[in-house]
């Protein structure tokens, strides 16, 4: 069984890149070149284990691999690569992974240049005190401009890129130079073997056979199989059943020392019992203080998930419980809706997280789902001095008791080619944005806006992509709460409120949103035998109305000539019947109408 490795022979690093700049391909090449995985087991994006990660070309969970590399100086180094998610929703996972390593490879596409997510992740790496080695990928493309991109890295990020490593991850060009740069330009970890055990919990996932598998980075001390360890945030104590390193398959190891990254299993039942960023120490003679910077994951965006077929509710419950085993940041509770039946109110870290969870439920568990309009968490300050959190617009308290409402704001960084800048500024302005900064890097502009999260969760990203023909990149951080004039808009169909369509809107935009919603519903709801009013209302005040006219039979068809009062009598009789029908009639709203109304392009 392999033993511990000396500190000066370890290099821990992560790869920072924007989506599609070749991060996972580079990881594949490093693994391939060092023979870590046999050729026959090699597949593209080997560290992305979920189908959805491969398909969307994104990394959702942090993954790790230990590579043994015989360097040119004759010594064999242990390289631990943590493949981090690049997307903003998973920013906390990124920050923890960053704290677990000492250096980063900054991968930039030599034809595209620096993008918004590259920036966000580089700043996180710099915050974590990383040494950063710039790597320019795709230099074999005809459109590659390494010199322009080098100067862009220096201008935008302020890193010296003169000795950037030039590679093509696809063809394997320049990969040996990357390995040498990791060994010689990134620092070895620090740590004290004799000190009490202090290890950081970097990630955890659920395995059907082993229970919860926990990935750790040892800071000080030594951890061995059979030790009793304690999680400092939850206070739970476990006995270690198995210690291993990932190559990417598990290889058992007797002990892990300072600077090493590995995994352990300890009969832990749920991923919720392990908090990313927690500190692990020995039950007896443990370390005095936990590692700084821990914070529990807080859901930011909420939406309702309902099965299209009510009989699938139990299947949905099972699927959600299984997913939650593996995703501690995903929260759920049951909810009922008059329009959609039984379902769940779920909380997510952001829009991509919501899409990924929904896709996984539909794909892995074969469910048909309706997603209600995503909403954010509002803070409602009541007149009696109490504070309520509002996750679902239907739970909005009576406005007479409300003092004011605060909504979450974000700081959005958008990188966009110059010619689309005007459209992007207009889009942000329309979404109640406040411009904070505008700067240029070559032919690309970088705009920083303060925006309400409520305006972004709906369809901001899609609109941004369409006004910029797909060239803009977008990244955001949540900055805090601010008071604004927000109201709850209800939709009434035939004078009955439809809970699934109610939403929180800004007072100035309510009329526009209301009008668009009722016009859309008028197209979507089929005609009935009686006329149906569709209204958008704030409190008791109707702000927009459309009427779906009734289908009617020509009751006077059988009257030939003769007296007009005969026709009148038949028409009045029909009118009275329609009135009675409207009183007792139920309006059937088809599922498709809900789905389309919630996709509304505002």
Curated annotation (Swiss-Prot):
BP GO terms, sorted: positive regulation of translation
Domain tr-type G: 8-190
Coiled-coil blocks: none
PROSITE patterns listed in its UniProt record: G_TR_1, G_TR_2
GO molecular function, one term: ribosome binding
Family annotation (SUPFAM superfamilies): EF-G C-terminal domain-like, P-loop containing nucleoside triphosphate hydrolases
Gene3D superfamilies, per database record: 3.30.70.240, Elongation factor 4, C-terminal domain (3.30.70.2570), Elongation Factor G (Translational Gtpase), domain 3 (3.30.70.870), P-loop containing nucleotide triphosphate hydrolases (3.40.50.300), Translation factors (2.40.30.10)
Keywords, ordered alphabetically: Cell inner membrane, Cell membrane, GTP-binding, Hydrolase, Membrane, Nucleotide-binding, Protein biosynthesis
Topology in membrane: Peripheral membrane protein
EC number: 3.6.5.n1
Cellular component GO terms, alphabetical: plasma membrane
Binding site for GTP: 20-25, 137-140
Enzyme class, UniProt record, top EC level: hydrolase
Annotated localization: Cell inner membrane
Catalytic activity field: GTP + H2O = GDP + phosphate + H(+)
Family: Belongs to the TRAFAC class translation factor GTPase superfamily. Classic translation factor GTPase family. LepA subfamily.
Role according to the record: Required for accurate and efficient protein synthesis under certain stress conditions. May act as a fidelity factor of the translation reaction, by catalyzing a one-codon backward translocation of tRNAs on improperly translocated ribosomes. Back-translocation proceeds from a post-translocation (POST) complex to a pre-translocation (PRE) complex, thus giving elongation factor G a second chance to translocate the tRNAs correctly. Binds to ribosomes in a GTP-dependent manner.
Name the UniProt record assigns to this protein: Elongation factor 4
Source organism: Cereibacter sphaeroides (strain ATCC 17023 / DSM 158 / JCM 6121 / CCUG 31486 / LMG 2827 / NBRC 12203 / NCIMB 8253 / ATH 2.4.1.)
């Amino acid at each position: 069984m392999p033993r511990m490795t000396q500190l000066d022979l370890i290099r821990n690093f992560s790869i920072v890149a924007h989506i599609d700049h070749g991060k996972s391909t580079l990881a594949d090449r490093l693994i391939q070149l060092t023979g870590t995985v046999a050729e026959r087991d090699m597949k593209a994006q080997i560290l992305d284990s979920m189908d959805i990660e491969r398909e969307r070309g994104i990394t959702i969970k942090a993954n790790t691999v230990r590579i043994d590399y015989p360097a040119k100086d004759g010594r064999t180094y242990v390289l631990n690569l943590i493949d981090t998610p690049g997307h903003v929703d998973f920013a906390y996972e990124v920050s923890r992974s960053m704290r677990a390593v000492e250096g980063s490879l900054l991968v930039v596409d030599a034809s595209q240049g620096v993008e918004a997510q590259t920036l966000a992740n580089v700043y996180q790496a710099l915050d974590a005190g990383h040494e950063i080695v710039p790597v320019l990928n795709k230099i074999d493309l005809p459109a590659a401009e390494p010199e322009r991109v080098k100067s862009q890295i220096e201008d935008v990020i302020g890193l010296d890129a003169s000795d950037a490593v030039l590679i093509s991850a696809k063809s394997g060009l320049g990969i040996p130079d990357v390995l040498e740069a990791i060994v010689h330009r990134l620092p070895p970890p620090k740590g004290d073997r004799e000190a009490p055990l202090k290890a950081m919990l970097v990630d955890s996932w659920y395995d059907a056979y082993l229970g919860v598998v926990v990935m750790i980075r040892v800071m000080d001390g030594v951890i061995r199989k059979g030790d009793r360890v304690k999680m400092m945030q939850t206070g739970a104590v476990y006995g270690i059943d198995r210690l291993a390193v990932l190559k990417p398959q598990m290889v058992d190891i007797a002990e892990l020392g300072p600077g090493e990254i590995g995994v352990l299993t300890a009969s832990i039942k749920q991923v919720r019992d392990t908090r990313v960023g927690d500190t692990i120490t020995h039950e007896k003679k443990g370390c005095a203080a936990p590692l700084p910077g821990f914070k529990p994951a807080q859901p930011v965006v909420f939406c309702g998930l309902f099965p299209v077929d009510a009989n699938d509710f139990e299947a949905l419950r099972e699927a959600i419980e299984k997913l939650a085993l593996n995703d501690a940041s995903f929260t759920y509770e049951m909810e009922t809706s008059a329009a959609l039946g039984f379902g769940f109110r779920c909380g997510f870290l952001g829009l991509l997280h919501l899409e990924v969870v929904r896709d996984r439920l539909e794909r892995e568990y074969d469910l048909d789902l309706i997603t209600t309009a995503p909403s954010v968490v509002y803070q409602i300050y009541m007149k009696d001095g109490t504070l309520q959190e509002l996750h679902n617009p239907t739970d909005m308290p009576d406005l007479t008791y409300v003092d004011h409402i605060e909504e979450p704001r974000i700081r959005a960084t958008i990188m966009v080619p110059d010619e689309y800048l005007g459209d992007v500024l207009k889009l942000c302005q329309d979404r109640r944005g406040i411009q904070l900064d505008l700067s240029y890097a070559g032919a690309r502009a970088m705009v920083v806006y303060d925006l309400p999260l409520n305006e972004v969760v709906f369809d901001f990203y899609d609109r941004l992509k369409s006004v910029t023909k797909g060239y803009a990149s977008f990244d955001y951080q949540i900055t805090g709460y601010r008071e604004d004039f927000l109201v709850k808009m209800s939709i009434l169909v035939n004078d009955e409120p439809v809970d699934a369509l109610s939403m929180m809107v800004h007072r100035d935009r309510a009329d526009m949103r209301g009008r668009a919603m009722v016009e859309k519903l008028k197209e979507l709801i089929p005609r009935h035998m009686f006329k149906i009013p569709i209204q958008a209302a704030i409190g008791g005040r109707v702000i927009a109305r459309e009427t779906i006219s009734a289908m009617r039979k020509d009751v006077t068809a059988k009257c030939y000539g003769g007296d007009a009062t005969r026709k009148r009598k038949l028409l009045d009789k029909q009118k009275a019947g329609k009135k009675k029908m409207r009183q007792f009639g139920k309006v059937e709203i088809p599922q498709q109408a809900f789905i389309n109304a919630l996709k509304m392009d505002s």
